[in-house]
């Protein structure tokens, strides 16, 4: 039996990964992390979606220690979430240092226990918010270290790494879940479900990708099929 663990936040990217994983694996587990994030609603959204989509199990892990160590606008109410600035340089204050290091490592430990061969994460390097822990080289390096440390080949999969947001929408649509991803996921840094606040960086990426996809569905769908090998 093929098993996978999805690092699951209930946002657009991880939900699209879950939708695809359910088609590719016999048994899919979801792991969501409670790190004292600014908007706890994402945990509730993740619970609802994991149940609705048919994950074998959904585990919410308490990692609130991360909140004490990592100062970010996503962990501190006193730090405002910035509006999207297309020309902004550097790492944004929404970056939570060490988050993906911790999440992927703990997900791998869980995968070890349930005998899963893969940990799936929705990180992307094509159009992202400048987070260093979303890069392909980081994921591969951590995957190598974790596999060595466990003496087990647990594979980190990043199905969205080299596709853009328009193609991520196309992937959801390919599996018949575009409306669900649009209306029932929570990606917004200000904690607003669906289309979100419309002015944070996460909402801007999401909306621009959706508009691009809806404006030229055939071209974008053809591109995602070519990149992923979907028929």
Swiss-Prot record:
The entry's keywords: ATP-binding, Ligase, Metal-binding, Nucleotide-binding, Queuosine biosynthesis, Zinc
GO molecular function: ATP binding; ligase activity, forming carbon-nitrogen bonds; zinc ion binding
GO biological process: queuosine biosynthetic process
Cofactor(s) the protein needs: Zn(2+)
Annotated binding of Zn(2+), by residue: 188, 197, 200, 203
Keyword NAD: no
EC assignment: 6.3.4.20
Class of this enzyme: ligase
Transmembrane segments: none
A Pfam family reported for this protein in Swiss-Prot or TrEMBL: QueC
Co-factor note (free text): Binds 1 zinc ion per subunit.
Binding site for ATP: 8-18
Transmembrane as UniProt keyword: no
Reactions accelerated catalytically: 7-carboxy-7-deazaguanine + NH4(+) + ATP = 7-cyano-7-deazaguanine + ADP + phosphate + H2O + H(+)
Pathway linked to the protein: Purine metabolism; 7-cyano-7-deazaguanine biosynthesis
Family: Belongs to the QueC family.
Function: Catalyzes the ATP-dependent conversion of 7-carboxy-7-deazaguanine (CDG) to 7-cyano-7-deazaguanine (preQ(0)).
PANTHER family recorded: 7-CYANO-7-DEAZAGUANINE SYNTHASE (PTHR42914:SF1)
Name of this protein: 7-cyano-7-deazaguanine synthase
Gene that this sequence comes from: queC
């Amino acid at each position: 039996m093929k098993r996978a663990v999805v690092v699951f936040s209930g946002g657009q990217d991880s939900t699209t990964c879950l939708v695809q994983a359910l088609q590719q694996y016999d048994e899919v587990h979801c792991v969501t992390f409670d790190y004292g994030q600014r908007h706890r609603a994402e945990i509730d959204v993740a619970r609802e979606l994991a149940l609705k989509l048919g994950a074998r199990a959904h585990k919410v892990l308490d990692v609130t220690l991360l909140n004490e160590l990592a100062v970010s606008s996503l962990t501190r109410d006193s730090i405002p979430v910035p509006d999207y600035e297309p020309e902004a340089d550097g790492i944004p204050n929404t970056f939570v240092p060490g988050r993906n290091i911790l999440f992927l490592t703990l997900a791998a430990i869980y995968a070890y226990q349930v005998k899963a061969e893969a940990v799936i994460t929705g990180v992307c390097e094509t159009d992202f918010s400048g987070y260093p822990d979303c890069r392909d080289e980081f994921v591969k390096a951590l995957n190598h270290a974790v596999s060595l440390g466990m003496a087990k080949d647990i594979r980190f999969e990043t199905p969205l790494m080299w596709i853009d947001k328009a193609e991520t929408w196309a992937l959801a649509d390919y599996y018949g879940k575009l409306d669900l991803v649009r209306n029932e996921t929570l990606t917004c840094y200000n904690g607003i479900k669906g289309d979100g606040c419309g002015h944070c960086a996460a909402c801007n990426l999401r909306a621009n990708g959706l508009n691009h996809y809806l404006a030229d569905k055939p071209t974008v769908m053809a591109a995602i099929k070519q990149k992923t090998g979907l028929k």
